[in-house]
Amino acid sequence: DDCLNLRKGIYYIENLLLSDCKDKGINVSYNSKANIENLLLKNSTTAIYAKDSSDIYIKNAILKNIEYCIASYRTKRNYAGSKVKYKNINYCPESKKIKGEGSVINN
């Protein structure tokens, strides 16, 4: 149900278009690092989701028809929280962010 699942790695992605993701647009997990620049994401429950010791940096994103723009969690005890840092997202108010204990979301 996710468009892009990134696990246990380091990723650099430019010019990404994702559409009609049922659950998550981008899901980064299990101690991964993802740098994403120039993202267009449409029709998803959660646009950007980090979990379990993962870090995401997003620069230049356009999000359309999403329920939550960013979520950052720890779901497994053997991992720490996650971090999402972003710059220039068209629409991401605090009410559209979900942050779990020990996780960080900032711009």
Which residue ranges define each predicted feature?
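Extracellular beta-rich repeat passengers
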Residues: D1-N107
